[in-house]
Amino acid sequence: MTDSMADSKTDSKTDDMTGATAPLVQLERYTRFWNTGPDGDRDRLAATVFTDEVEYRALVGLLRGPAALADFRDRFVSHAGPATVRRREEPEVHHGRARLRWEILTGDGTSFATGTDVIEFAGDGRISGIAAFLDRAPEGFDPTAHD
């Protein structure tokens, strides 16, 4: 992280006026959520990252609530094996939204897929909505199989 980024208001832990968690902090937690299995501290992490009504919209469908996102992650890992989500670049944030470009790496470090999440923040700084787009789909992925 550059010094200028460390000094920016968006990198502080909370907004002094509202007490809301800063977007870049939440995006770091968001990435950590996708990399935390059921044996980790995922429920506590989810409560700090997501609103109770968070909506996740992707080609695979519409998911509602942190438990549905955790289940989606667990089903993916049970099917594909160990996987890690990493950010491809620094997220862009403005007007209560963020664009986060990600990559999923398999257990051996092979790139599985890349994508972009457009994330909406609630007034308290937690994530209330995610629209997930595939930039490079996994090999053999059929987008019509999830209609």
PLM region spans:
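Short, flexible active-site loop motifs that bind/organize anionic cofactors or intermediates
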Residues: T36, L59, D117
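Hydrophobic alpha-helical core bundles mediating ligand binding, dimerization, or RNAP-core interactions
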Residues: L27-W34, F50, R73-F76, L100-W102, ...
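Short acidic-aromatic low-complexity motifs
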Residues: M17-V49
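A solvent-exposed, acidic/Ser-Thr-rich amphipathic alpha-helical stretch
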Residues: L24, D43-G96
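A beta-strand edge to alpha-helix "cap/lid" segment located at domain peripheries
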Residues: T2-D3, D15-T18, V77-D147
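Hydrophobic pocket/interface hotspot
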Residues: Y30, L45-A46, V54, G65, ...
